[in-house]
Each structure stands twice: as C-alpha cells, then as structure tokens.
From Swiss-Prot:
Cu cation A1 binds at H161, C196, C200, M207. InterPro entries: CcO_II (IPR045187), CcO_II-like_C (IPR002429), CcO_II_C (IPR034210), Copper_CuA (IPR001505), Cupredoxin (IPR008972), Cyt_c_oxidase_su2 (IPR014222), Cyt_c_oxidase_su2_TM_dom (IPR011759), Cyt_c_oxidase_su2_TM_sf (IPR036257). Belongs to the cytochrome c oxidase subunit 2 family. Pfam families: COX2 (PF00116), COX2_TM (PF02790). Mg(2+) binds at E198. It comes from Canis simensis (Ethiopian wolf). GO terms for biological process: ATP synthesis coupled electron transport. The modification Phosphotyrosine is found at Y218. It catalyses: 4 Fe(II)-[cytochrome c] + O2 + 8 H(+)(in) = 4 Fe(III)-[cytochrome c] + 2 H2O + 4 H(+)(out). This is Cytochrome c oxidase subunit 2. Its cofactor is Cu cation. Keywords: Copper, Electron transport, Magnesium, Membrane, Metal-binding, Mitochondrion, Mitochondrion inner membrane, Phosphoprotein, Respiratory chain, Translocase, Transmembrane, Transmembrane helix, Transport. Component of the cytochrome c oxidase, the last enzyme in the mitochondrial electron transport chain which drives oxidative phosphorylation. The respiratory chain contains 3 multisubunit complexes succinate dehydrogenase (complex II, CII), ubiquinol-cytochrome c oxidoreductase (cytochrome b-c1 complex, complex III, CIII) and cytochrome c oxidase (complex IV, CIV), that cooperate to transfer electrons derived from NADH and succinate to molecular oxygen, creating an electrochemical gradient over the inner membrane that drives transmembrane transport and the ATP synthase. The chain crosses the membrane at residues 15-45, 60-87.
Length: 227
C-alpha cells in the first residue's frame, strides 16, 4: 500500500501491475534521455556562439527530427498496446464477483454462490481500533482466493463511480445501466486497499475498498460461514 512521501507506484501484487511497472520504467527512461538531450542543446546555445544562423535549407536535420520522434512514439505505443490488450483478456475465471457502487458505499455479490452478498461501508474514524487506517478500513472486506483468476463485474446504482485498487493495477468505471468487467489475480496473500476514483458527490472520499486475499482453503471456510 502507499506510504507518506512516496514517489513511485505501489508494490505490484498482480502480473498486470508488474507489466505496468515495467512500462512505467521504460517510458521514464525515454523521457529522461529526451530531457537530457534538450538540456544539453540549451546549454550549448547559452554558452557558445550561434552558427548557421542564415541557413535556409537543412534536409538532413529535418529528416532526423521527423523520423526520430516517430521511432520514439512507436517504442512507447507498442508495449502500451500490449498491456492494454492483456488487461482486456478474460481467461476462464474461477470466481465471479459483482460490485455495485452506491452513494457512498459498495455492495458485493458472489454470483457463484446462492446467497453470498453484503454491503461494505467505511468505518468512521472514532470507531477505528489501534493500528487501523483512517478512511481506508471497512466493516466487510472482500475476501478472495489468491493465485486464481477472478472476474469482477462492476456497475452503479446511482451516479458514476470507479472501483480502483492500485497495487493490483485495477481501475474500472462503475456506470449506471452498464456492466463493465475486469479480472484480477493476486500473487500473494494480504490486505489491499483502494478507493472510489471518480468524483461522485460529497462523500466521495469515504468509499474505501479492502480486498483480503487468502489461500483457497481459507476462502472456502469463509464462504461456508457466510452462506
């Protein structure tokens, strides 16, 4: 999860987030090289006498500054498109969970079970226990099995919301009258926090998301107790 004064992204907990981190580093390196080149050229212009101020034609230079940006854009676009298509893949999910956004809480329904559904509200600050996180804890966590492909169906009952968990690389809009879907798979157990990421009203900041990823045996025990 995030920590104070953090400069980078959250630690990756899913294959998709790993890919996004690699793409971030790849793009950041390209930006760094371009910025270094521009700063070098500016420093030369400020410290040396300008030459070729009356040049009317420079075919070689024009060719370079046309082709080079095109190559750079291709180097950014190709890995970006690859990840985009990976995020849209649905590969035989082991479990489906339907998520509905409300003003201002989330409701969850495990569609593979006959009667497993609940609402998830933020715990008020005055009711937090020692060690719990302000504005991030909920009364009912979403318990899911780790190392399994899970499909999330996401929609809204009222206004636009967005269901986001940064460490899993997830952000899907919850739109009234429309059912969006995404997949997730956590590679290790733990608690993963997120929040509504679309301004949805006065209590937009009070719609946290908590995923509790557990081994399959623990999930089966939990689901048996909940049904």
């Amino acid at each position: 999860m995030a920590y104070p004064f953090q400069l980078g992204l959250q630690d990756a907990t899913s294959p998709i987030m790993e890919e996004l981190l690699h793409f971030h580093d790849h793009t950041l390196m390209i930006v760094f090289l371009i910025s270094s080149l521009i700063l070098y050229i500016i420093s030369l212009m400020l410290t040396t006498k300008l030459t070729h101020t009356s040049t009317m034609d420079a075919q070689e230079v024009e060719t370079v500054w046309t082709i080079l940006p095109a190559i750079i854009l291709i180097l950014i676009a190709l890995p970006s498109l690859r990840i985009l298509y990976m995020m849209d893949e649905i590969n035989n999910p082991s479990l489906t969970v339907k998520t509905m956004g409300h003003q201002w809480y989330w409701s969850y329904e495990y569609t593979d079970y006959e009667d497993l559904n609940f609402d998830s509200y933020m715990i008020p600050t005055q009711e937090l226990k020692p060690g719990e996180l302000r504005l991030l804890e909920v009364d009912n966590r979403v318990v899911l099995p780790m190392e399994m492909t899970i499909r999330m169906l996401i929609s809204s009952e009222d206004v636009l919301h967005s269901w986001a968990v940064p460490s899993l690389g997830l952000k899907t809009d919850a739109i009234p009258g429309r059912l969006n879907q995404t997949t997730l798979m956590a590679t290790r157990p733990g608690l993963y926090y997120g929040q509504c990421s679309e301004i949805c009203g006065s209590n937009h900041s009070f719609m946290p998301i908590v995923l509790e990823m557990v081994p399959l045996s623990y999930f089966e025990t939990w689901s048996a107790l909940m049904v």
